[in-house]
Amino acid sequence: HLNEEQESSRQPLTRRFIVTEALFERDGTITHLPQIVELKKKYKFRMVLDESYSAGILGNTGRGLTELQNVDPDDVDIIVGNLAIAFSTAGGFCASTKEIVKHQRINGLSFVFSAAMPVMMANGSTVAMDLLDGDLSVFERLRENTSILRNALAPISAITITSSPESPLLHVQLRPSEDDTNLAVLYSDPKAHASWMASQQEVLKKIERLALNQGVWISRNPHIPSIRAELDQGPWARPSLRIIATSALSPAEMRQAADIVRASIVSVLGS
């Protein structure tokens, strides 16, 4: 498509940006950064990488997708992220050249409207980063707990896990039944699609409540309809349970929690 567009315009495609999440919140998949960087260099695009769900999470030292996939951070023009995820504070970050960072800073809400977040929250982000830098065992434990959770749920034939193996954010969907196979027809009928989505949510709600009654909190992934209907016509748009592995639990505690989630799923769906 890009080749055709460039040939038709007979000149380089300028002012084009590739914008992507590193770890996608919607389905837990991880983007293949080396391929995107290759595409960026080939067409001379600029790139913005959102590391909200990967900074402080992915990589041996928590430095995100560039570390996990061994990509030079200088190959990414702008790296941004939300500090409310792994760092449990507020605000965000922008990593780039001095010129770009300065532009972002002077055009940010905190500068334009003098609405900076409390100093305590900013300091909390710094402390969180220092803690992660000082204790790399956190990442080892997170990877182990992610593996424990995934291995506990993967054998259940009634579900499918959409997330990448390295992702501690697991999205669990109901495996499509024979009645669901013709999804193209289902998507073409708004009423039938809405009814199908509601029935899926109801089943997931039962699993959610069973786990909660046994002391494990999981949640259904909130779904906001897209302004373009075709964007809701893929595996990522189907209702799912959102389950997050955490380094705050010991491996034994993670196994116990995973067993409860597995038992809740099997109780509702069967093995």
Language-model region placement:
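Active-site phosphate-binding strand-loop segment of PLP-dependent enzymes
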Residues: 1-48
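Conserved strand-to-helix beginnings and helix N-cap segments that scaffold or border functional pockets
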Residues: 29-34, 59-62, 94, 238, ...
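Active-site C-terminal subdomain of aminotransferase-like
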Residues: 43-46, 53, 58-167, 172-179, ...
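A common structural junction motif
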Residues: 112, 212-217, 261-270
